[in-house]
UniProtKB/Swiss-Prot annotation:
It comes from Homo sapiens. Transmembrane segments: none annotated. PROSITE patterns: CYTOCHROME_P450. PANTHER family: CYTOCHROME P450, CYTOCHROME P450 FAMILY 24 SUBFAMILY A MEMBER 1. This is 1,25-dihydroxyvitamin D(3) 24-hydroxylase, mitochondrial. The keyword Kinase does not apply. GO terms for molecular function: 1-alpha,25-dihydroxyvitamin D3 23-hydroxylase activity; 1-alpha,25-dihydroxyvitamin D3 24-hydroxylase activity; 25-hydroxycholecalciferol-23-hydroxylase activity; 25-hydroxycholecalciferol-24-hydroxylase activity; heme binding; iron ion binding; vitamin D3 25-hydroxylase activity. Gene3D superfamilies: Cytochrome P450. Disulfide bonds: none annotated. The keyword Mitochondrion applies. Heme binds at C462.
Length: 514
């Protein structure tokens, strides 16, 4: 039976889902990630010469009154298969096109040089799509805004406070003991749940539990007990609240939140109650940390951020809440897909195992510094994020008129950066349907850095990127060293868009002890 957490949608995922049409699935056959650096590049063929045209001249699918292109999306497989439809549309309409769903209109980008052009024109405070239901709740309860809602100088100030801890490799490396503590328990959990064939029922749910426990230990130094046989009420209520908040949030992005609030609809009531539960739990955890380390704040992750940067408590509560929500499912989703890819590519898994064994003596717990000597492990994660990304697109809202390609786009234009389209294109990756980590290690195979952006790009890049990578790299060390991840069938698995990109069925993998 599926647990509540397996059904919850990640923050990042929902964000993406709102900003664009939903996408179609594709069949899945078969990191030290660094942000793109300024470089000398040839003139982009999409921007070279010629007069600019206005946005109305953009190609795109037929837009009908009221519905926009929704009927075509549904005809091509529904909202869960939207990502595949976007691949098709880019082939048909080119690297930049417009699409409208209902009243929501966006411009889609599917070329590295267009993303680079956008990156180079980015303002000091890049904007993303407004999340009205969240803002409505915060205003209603007089709570603060976090990094996913804040804009302008306030966003920069709060992001800078967290960036000092979360974006510096040396600071993140200090968290490996906590991550390993949860991973040790997770290995025991897998042993406990495996049947005689090595199958774990509802694996995605278990991976979410691992991710939740890991981020909570990092943020609060607290374990919620989700990897134990009987989780406590607090953990269950918290997870149920996340599930409810996400489901109601999605509905209020389709119909005006102002209407729900004024009529006090059940959706608004449930949304508000869910946020109340989430904030109550987060506040209790943070207040406990602040009190415990009041005399020595530098010894604690959150206390140091709070005291060093003079954030208000409301700002700290909101930012941590959003960071936690954004981290849980996307990290679990990434681990799920790389386990699947390794199961379908045993030769890659064997090569990865040899690298891990060459660096780590038997039974030695992996440390952050050990990962420096594991380039193939990092390449495996990078390749998995390219082939089977957690989310198929990110977004931007132009805060000034901008020329992209040959089109002049007005201020306020919502841009869909179709990163999954980039990763699946033969123009960017030879044999793009193949899981081949070696491509990231071969100098002769030059890859445009703007063709692979799993954590976004620019100043609003995912602030938890380094932490997520550390969690995933260490998890691979633990899992691959202990288990042979085997495919239990060779039938293709579809990717469906459900906030994150999820498998169409229970993944056919088994954990066989080495």
């Amino acid at each position: 039976m599926s647990s509540p957490i397996s059904k919850s949608r990640s923050l990042a995922a929902f964000l993406q889902q709102l900003r664009s049409p939903r996408q179609p699935p594709r069949l899945v056959t078969s990191t030290a990630y660094t942000s793109p650096q300024p470089r000398e590049v040839p003139v982009c063929p999409l921007t070279a010469g010629g007069e600019t045209q206005n946005a109305a001249a953009l190609p795109g699918p037929t837009s009908w009154p009221l519905l926009g292109s929704l009927l075509q999306i549904l005809w091509k497989g529904g909202l869960k298969k939207q990502h595949d439809t976007l691949v098709e549309y880019h082939k048909k309409y080119g690297k930049i096109f417009r699409m409208k769903l209902g009243s929501f209109e966006s411009v889609h980008l599917g070329s590295p040089c267009l993303l680079e052009a956008l990156y180079r024109t980015e303002s000091a405070y890049p904007q993303r799509l407004e999340i009205k239901p969240w803002k409505a709740y915060r205003d209603y309860r007089k709570e603060g805004y976090g990094l996913l809602i804040l804009e302008g100088e306030d966003w920069q100030r709060v992001r800078s406070a967290f960036q000092k801890k979360l974006m510096k490799p040396g600071e993140v490396m200090k968290l490996d003991n906590k991550i390993n503590e949860v991973l040790a328990d997770f290995m025991g959990r897998i042993d406990e749940l495996c049947d005689e064939r090595g199958h774990v029922e509802d694996l995605y749910s278990e991976l979410n539990k691992w991710s939740f426990e890991s981020i909570c230990l990092v943020l609060y130094e607290k374990r919620f007990g989700l990897l134990q046989k009987n989780a406590g009420d607090e953990a269950v209520n918290f997870i149920m609240a996340i599930k409810t908040m996400m489901s109601t949030f999605g509905r209020m992005m389709v119909t005006p939140v102002e209407l729900h609030k004024s009529l006090n609809t059940k959706v608004w009531q449930d949304h508000t109650l869910a946020w109340d539960t989430i904030f109550k739990s987060v506040k209790a955890c943070i207040d406990n940390r602040l009190e415990k380390y009041s005399q020595q704040p530098s010894a604690d992750f959150l206390c140091d951020i709070y005291h060093q940067n003079r954030l208000s408590k409301k700002e700290l509560y909101a930012a941590v809440t959003e960071l936690q929500l954004a981290a849980v499912e996307t990290t679990a989703n990434s681990l799920m897909w790389i386990l699947y890819n390794l199961s379908r590519n045993p030769q890659v898994q064997q090569k990865l195992l040899k690298e891990i064994q060459s660096v780590l003596p038997e039974n030695q717990v992996p440390r952050a510094e050990d990962l420096r000597n594991m380039p193939y492990l990092k390449a495996c994660l990078k390749e998995s994020m390219r082939l089977t990304p957690s989310v198929p697109f990110t977004t931007r809202t132009l805060d000034k008129a901008t020329v992209l390609g040959e089109y002049a786009l007005p201020k306020g234009t919502v841009l869909m950066l179709n990163t999954q389209v980039l990763g699946s294109s033969e123009d960017n990756f030879e044999d793009s349907s193949q899981f081949r980590p070696e491509r990231w290690l071969q100098e002769k195979e030059k890859i445009n850095p703007f063709a692979h952006l799993p954590f976004g790009v620019g100043k609003r890049m995912c602030i938890g990127r380094r932490l997520a990578e550390l969690q995933l790299h260490l998890a691979l060390c633990w899992i691959v060293r202990k288990y042979d991840i085997q495919a239990t069938d060779n039938e293709p698995v579809e990717m469906l868009h459900s906030g994150t990109l999820v498998p169409s069925r229970e993944l056919p993998i088994a954990f066989c002890q080495r």
